[in-house]
Structure formats: structure tokens, C-alpha cells
Regions:
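Transmembrane alpha-helical segments of polytopic membrane transport and secretion proteins
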Residues: 1-6, 10, 209-248
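Short cytoplasmic-facing helical segments at TM-TM junctions of multi-pass membrane proteins
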Residues: 109-155
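Short, well-ordered beta-strand elements
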Residues: 252-264
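Hydrophobic alpha-helical transmembrane segments of polytopic membrane proteins
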Residues: 177-213
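Loop-to-helix entry region at the N-terminal start of transmembrane alpha-helices
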Residues: 11-22, 72-108
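Transmembrane alpha-helices
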Residues: 24, 136-168, 191, 195, ...
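Cytoplasmic-entry segments and transmembrane alpha-helices of multi-pass inner-membrane transporters
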Residues: 37-72, 101, 111-118, 225-230, ...
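Periplasmic/extracellular loop-to-transmembrane helix junction in inner-membrane transport proteins
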Residues: 1-26, 140
Length: 271
């Protein structure tokens, strides 16, 4: 058992780095899309109905099915890109995982952004309008600051969802902490399964706690909590990714192995 634990921990920095990179990228992309869409939805009931309905529909699709769904889509688009531009892009690995997790992260951010902006006291908005603020000034100086605690709660939920769902990216060729779980189940290596579950749960708890500090700092107007949470996230991100650039891509390899895998239509990864 000690040998298995040592072997599992030896590849933890690589798998944790990939897991953090994937989760952070998906969350950042989801935030960049869902936040402006949520603000716009708060001003348009029709757009709000369409946006929340679409994001809710995505949530009804099981995470693993959503990840797998992008493989044939990207395979088709890659074939078209080869004919048009002369080169394609990976249909397995980081790209489909990123797209699926981005969609999966959008609902809580979108819902809370729309609810937060809509919930701002109309009297406050009218007072801002009365002192001559433009629509943009009201948004940035009044509405978004007041809605920030609600929005941060959505980001916090989305982060935990994304970290958990990222463990399911292993079957589509992306290295993550899920490699421990899937390979351990295949080989009945319960030490690997335990390490994967503990690492992913621990990561989710740490991120949730740090985002909770930021949420509390925003809600209570306490800069110390805000900076403590932000600094913790930055330090944690850098610590997780520090050994990651030194790792080289591994081409091919057996299913559920460490390192990104490629599809026949994808471009070649560096050796």
C-alpha cells in the first residue's frame, strides 16, 4: 500500500496542475460570457427567459455526456478546418473539456448576475440618474457594486461545480485528478481512487473557502477579507501551476494514462 501511495503522490503535481489549469480557464471563460449576459438579461425579460432557459437546459445534460458530446462536434469542425485552412485542432483533450466545463459553469453566474442587478433598489438607481449619471456610470458605480455579493455567490458555486466536473474529463483525453479515479477503478487500485477523491474534494474546499472570504469582504465592505481571499487564490494558483510548465506533453499512451491524448484529426502535440 505504501508503494501505491508513493506512486500516486509522485504524479500529483502534474495532475493537480492540469486540473487547476482546466478549472480556472473554464471558470474565467464562463465568467467572461455569463456576467455581461446576466447584466443584459436583467434589463430584458425576454433575454432573461432565453438565457436562463438555455443555461438550465445545459445543466440537465449529465457532465460526462456533455464532455463526450463535444468530441464528434469538434471532430467534424476540425475536418472542415483542415479542408479550409490546411490544419485542424484537437477533438480530444483540453479543448472539449474547456468548452463543456465553460457551459457547465455559466448557469449560477448568469442567474446570480441577473438576480443581483435586478434586485438593486430602484430608488437608488433613480437617485443616481437624478445626479446626472449615465447608464454606464450607474452600472459600474451603483448597480454592480451593490450586486457584487450576489454575483460572487454565483461564482463560488460555479467554481465548486467546475472543479468537481473536471474530474470527468479523463475519458475525453484530458489529464486531471480524475485520472486517479478512473484508472484506479479499472485496476482496482483503491489507493489511487482515494487519492483522487481526496485531492479533488480538498481543492474544491480550499477554493470555496477563499472565494467565501472574497464574498464576505465584498458584502461587508472589508478590504482585508477581500485581499486575503484574492491573495490566497493567486498564491494557490501559482503553487499548483509552478511544476506544470516543466512537464512535457506525452503523445499517445494507454487509456486513462497521464498526459493529454490526441485524436486522428487533431494536430500533433510536441514530443
Amino acid at each position: 500500500m505504501a508503494d501505491r501511495l508513493h506512486a500516486a503522490l509522485a504524479v500529483l503535481p502534474e495532475r493537480l496542475g492540469w486540473h487547476v489549469a482546466l478549472s480556472a480557464s473554464a471558470l474565467a471563460l464562463g465568467l467572461a460570457i455569463a456576467l455581461p449576459l446576466g447584466v443584459a438579461a436583467a434589463r430584458s425579460p425576454r433575454l432573461k427567459w432565453i438565457a436562463l432557459g438555455g443555461a438550465g437546459l445545459v445543466q440537465t445534460i449529465p457532465s460526462l455526456a456533455l464532455l463526450a458530446l463535444f468530441y464528434p462536434v469538434l471532430l467534424l469542425l476540425s475536418g472542415v478546418a483542415v479542408k479550409v485552412f490546411g490544419h485542424g485542432f484537437p477533438a480530444l483533450g483540453f479543448l472539449p473539456s474547456l468548452l463543456a466545463l465553460t457551459l457547465y459553469s455559466m448557469l449560477p453566474i448568469l442567474r446570480n448576475a441577473a438576480a443581483g442587478v435586478s434586485g438593486v433598489d430602484p430608488a437608488v438607481v433613480e437617485a443616481a440618474r437624478g445626479v446626472g449619471m449615465t447608464d454606464r456610470q450607474r452600472l459600474w458605480r451603483v448597480e454592480l457594486p451593490l450586486a457584487a455579493p450576489v454575483i460572487m455567490a454565483g461564482v463560488r458555486t460555479a467554481a465548486v461545480w467546475t472543479i468537481g466536473a473536471a474530474t470527468l474529463s479523463t475519458p475525453v483525453g484530458q489529464t486531471s485528478l480524475g485520472d486517479y479515479i478512473f484508472s484506479g477503478l479499472q485496476t482496482e487500485d483503491w489507493v489511487a481512487v482515494l487519492v483522487g477523491c481526496a485531492a479533488s474534494a480538498g481543492l474544491a474546499l480550499v477554493v470555496d473557502g477563499l472565494l467565501g472570504l472574497i464574498e464576505g469582504g465584498v458584502a461587508r465592505r472589508e478590504p482585508k477579507r477581500l485581499w486575503a481571499g484574492g491573495a490566497g487564490l493567486v498564491i494557490g494558483l501559482l503553487a499548483a501551476l509552478a511544476p506544470w510548465p516543466a512537464r512535457r506533453y506525452r503523445k499517445g499512451g494507454p487509456p486513462m494514462s497521464s498526459g493529454p491524448r490526441t485524436s486522428p484529426s487533431s494536430t500533433s502535440w510536441p514530443n
